[in-house]
Amino acid sequence: MTDLDFIDVADLRREYMKGGLRRHELTEQPLVLFEKWLKQACEARLSDPTAMCVATVDENGQPYQRIVLLKHFDEKGLVFYTNLGSRKASHLEHNQRVSLLFPWYPLERQVCFLGKAEKLSAFEVVKYFHSRPKDSQIAAWASKQSSRISARGVLESKFLELKQKFQHGEVPLPSFWGGYRVTFDSVEFWQGRENRLHDRFIYQKSPEGWSIERLAP
């Protein structure tokens, strides 16, 4: 196999047979249905059911995506944490609009939220930071996220240095570490169906509440 002998992906296909999504199964509030689907993803023992693809856009209009873990959700929004010097945080300084996608492939489902990311309060950040395993807290100090490094050894050496420094007592919260709450105004639920006639429903928020429409696949 040469470097140019790529896999022929055109014929990699299958039917989606896990079920459907009918209007009578929808809930008035999108977060209620999301919680139901998330519970089912957990019960199905999916790997990282809270993993979501977070899409942001830089000042030139170039979109970027990365996988981040959902850490909390309620009627106020969906919460994730990150290094405030990261690429995503830099983008959010210029444009707060984001897209969050939960791809639950084994269940042939996905949920996409559109909304605006706002920084969490210092109280929320401190509370969550100190709930993390100590090594994870130290790792937050060790990594200057999205910066270029010469080798992995540099990162590992820094981690070991900080582990020695913080071996006794509490790890302080880095000033460059925080979180965001995404307040959403659009949520789409997608369920794979046979013959590519997938079920899609979109919730959109207005002053009157949530409207629900079926979309063509």
UniProtKB/Swiss-Prot annotation:
Q: Which InterPro entries match?
A: Pyridox_Oxase, Pyridox_Oxase_CS, Pyridox_Oxase_N, Pyridoxamine_oxidase_dimer_C, Split_barrel_FMN-bd
**Residues spanning the membrane:** none
EC class name: oxidoreductase
Q: Which reaction does it catalyse?
A: pyridoxamine 5'-phosphate + O2 + H2O = pyridoxal 5'-phosphate + H2O2 + NH4(+); pyridoxine 5'-phosphate + O2 = pyridoxal 5'-phosphate + H2O2
Give the pathway annotation.
Cofactor metabolism; pyridoxal 5'-phosphate salvage; pyridoxal 5'-phosphate from pyridoxamine 5'-phosphate: step 1/1; Cofactor metabolism; pyridoxal 5'-phosphate salvage; pyridoxal 5'-phosphate from pyridoxine 5'-phosphate: step 1/1
What Gene3D superfamilies does the entry give? Electron Transport, Fmn-binding Protein, Chain A (2.30.110.10)
One of its GO biological process terms is: pyridoxine biosynthetic process
Q: Which is one Pfam family of this protein?
A: PNPOx_N
EC code(s) of this entry: 1.4.3.5
Q: Which cofactor does it need?
A: FMN
Instruction: Quote the record's binding site residues for FMN.
Output: 66-71, 81-82, 87-88, 110, 145-146, 190, 200
Coiled coil (UniProt feature)? none
GO MF annotations for this entry? FMN binding; pyridoxamine phosphate oxidase activity
Chain sites annotated for binding substrate: 13-16, 71, 128, 132, 136, 196-198
Cofactor descriptive note:
Binds 1 FMN per subunit.
Q: Which UniProt keywords apply?
A: Flavoprotein, FMN, Oxidoreductase, Pyridoxine biosynthesis
**How does the annotation summarize its subunit structure?**
Homodimer.
Q: What does this protein do?
A: Catalyzes the oxidation of either pyridoxine 5'-phosphate (PNP) or pyridoxamine 5'-phosphate (PMP) into pyridoxal 5'-phosphate (PLP).
Q: Which family does it belong to?
A: Belongs to the pyridoxamine 5'-phosphate oxidase family.
UniProt-recorded name of the protein: Pyridoxine/pyridoxamine 5'-phosphate oxidase
- Tell me what organism the protein belongs to: Proteus mirabilis (strain HI4320)
